[in-house]
């Protein structure tokens, strides 16, 4: 039995609330159960230096947790002088995931920065961030098109992410903190709306997992992401 009493293939309640930040070109408050992340997409009228003269744009991401997003207060990373290795890994993952479904030349030489700020963490902050970031990016592009900054939608597809793991010997979908902290295996899957795999992160915390178990986790993830993509579609309708 899962601590949340969910079925093995059941996700937490997921919500995607748009236009929650007044000044951002695109924004989304995403919740996966008790995990809450504010995603904002901001337009900069210049791209990174290494793309100057290429005609291509760029999409990047930054990730942070509020000090009291966790059970005990964590120190703001800005006070330590640089982001932690975990933070750098997650924000690079978010950026890669968004670029995988973006036609960068359609942006022109501009950059979109998507900020993902965790308000409350209960497992799955990176997967919630990717799922909500896509909605914020979608709305940023819609804002740009409405003002004739770009002529076509740069988004090629949806992208969403979900965690899976093996908890007490059973493959389960969308781990919360209680499950994640005790799981034998923890994995994150990033998948497009058409079913293309963008990234897989998987770790055996205790015993190695088998190929058959990995296939089970992948099947759970694809089912969960199909539901997330449908929620994205409804959110932007």
From Swiss-Prot:
CDD domains: RNase_PH_bact
The UniProt record lists the keyword tRNA-binding: yes
Alphabetical UniProt keywords: Nucleotidyltransferase, RNA-binding, rRNA processing, Transferase, tRNA processing, tRNA-binding
PROSITE patterns: RIBONUCLEASE_PH
UniProt keyword annotation of Membrane present: no
First-level EC class: transferase
EC number(s) stated in the UniProt entry for this protein: 2.7.7.56
GO term, biological process aspect, one: rRNA catabolic process
Gene3D superfamilies documented for this protein: GHMP Kinase, N-terminal domain
Top-level taxon of the source organism: Bacteria
Residue positions binding phosphate: 86, 124-126
Catalysis performed (reactions): tRNA(n+1) + phosphate = tRNA(n) + a ribonucleoside 5'-diphosphate
Gene Ontology MF annotations: 3'-5'-RNA exonuclease activity; tRNA binding; tRNA nucleotidyltransferase activity
Sequence similarity: Belongs to the RNase PH family.
Primary role: Phosphorolytic 3'-5' exoribonuclease that plays an important role in tRNA 3'-end maturation. Removes nucleotide residues following the 3'-CCA terminus of tRNAs; can also add nucleotides to the ends of RNA molecules by using nucleoside diphosphates as substrates, but this may not be physiologically important. Probably plays a role in initiation of 16S rRNA degradation (leading to ribosome degradation) during starvation.
The protein's assembly and partners: Homohexameric ring arranged as a trimer of dimers.
Name of the protein described by the UniProt record: Ribonuclease PH
Organism whose genome encodes this protein: Methylorubrum populi (strain ATCC BAA-705 / NCIMB 13946 / BJ001) (Methylobacterium populi)
Gene behind the chain: rph
